[in-house]
Amino acid sequence: MLGMEGMIQVLYYPNRESTIGDLNNNELAQIMMNSLINGTGANDKGIIEREDLIVLNQTKMPAIIIECGFLSNENEEKLILTDDYQNKMVDSIIDGLEEYFSLNLKD
């Protein structure tokens, strides 16, 4: 769909000592962004460190926020509402999580 590419942005909180094991928020954000861009063909709007978001800064485990698109953009809104794009997003998120945990949860 020409002109219908989405924009994906990933937000993360920098790690601190209380984070479980060696799991890394920045690494999770990078892996997820790569998986989403490759799986959906969307544009990379960036990976952004956010220390001010309680939903991220109060966790003791890896945590990110994936912004899958922006409804303020009419073309993007149409894209986000399609089953095909939603399925690509879900598959990409699953692939990214599988990659992240395969690298980080070794015995």
Question: What are the residue ranges of the model-derived segments?
Answer:
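Active-site-proximal helix/loop segments of hydrolytic enzymes
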Residues: 1-107
